[in-house]
Amino acid sequence: MRRLAAVALGGLLLAAGAVGAFAQAPANPVITTLTIFAGAAEGLWRSRDWGGSWERVQGAQGGAAPSGAVRSIHPIGPRVYVGAERQVLVSDDFGETWIALSVPGLVLAVLPSRYPQADSTLFVGTTEGLLKSPDAGRSFDRPTLAGVPVSRLEWPGPALVVATGRGVMVSLDGGASFTGPGTGLPGGDVLAIALSAFFVADPVLFAGTVADGVFRSRDGGKTWSPAGLDGQRVGDLVWLGPFLYAATAAGVQRSEDLGHTWVTLADGLEGRPVHRLLFPLAPASGAEIFAATDQGVWRSADGGLHWQRSGLNGRFVLSLGTFPPPLPVRGKKKG
């Protein structure tokens, strides 16, 4: 998981208004927001007050709306992509109205380009393989990695790194072909990946496995070595500065030494397994964390040391997302 630069929390959500379903997003939308999305086993939920209260996202009357299990949420503001049962849903008005794009298989991950104004590429990971759209979802190429579940996607460029049912695979040609999974990584599903912020020059990545803990590669996925949490299911990884966070059945785990040692951050989590993590202010701040569990959303305001409930009690939450923060405004230098 990698995130963009953040700014101080607060302010308003401003936009020029809704745009067409496939219209190009505004060049510089201002998004400083209190909105959090949560994908549950039975649809999409939204909080407009930083997890204080939640509402079901219904869409316009008679229109499409997210339903079924929502496993992936990717807001890029005002556009929001959601991966549901057998469809990708797209909103161009911050989640108020939606259109549905049918795809084969259950959708596990959705990843648009980091530069949507210039590049309309959209990748979709499903239980049936990897789909690529050159036009923001109007059409999809024939799937690659056919028959292989693709659960997570990272695209630092030029490499496309995917977590699959066969391990971690890497493509250098936009998903046309893949290499991997490399040596040293146990067979079976990889559920999470976290990449160096400077992956082109520093190709370090971590993989969270379904039953064997965390593994680390220093060479872009060619070779792997164990990085702790042996025997544990790792559903999410977030690498933030010196800290590596893992979502596990034992709660949230954190390492300060690239996986050599780990500490458990579970005070207040009531023993709940954690499936996903969201750091809405990263990388400027790692203090605020939201955690998706099988009994709702939890929130920490101190980097995971203490947790408290943040709504959707009793609901199995599978994914979390929020709008990326705006780029900082830079003044002109005097003189």
Please annotate each region the language model reported:
Residues 2-335:
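Extracellular glycan-interacting surfaces
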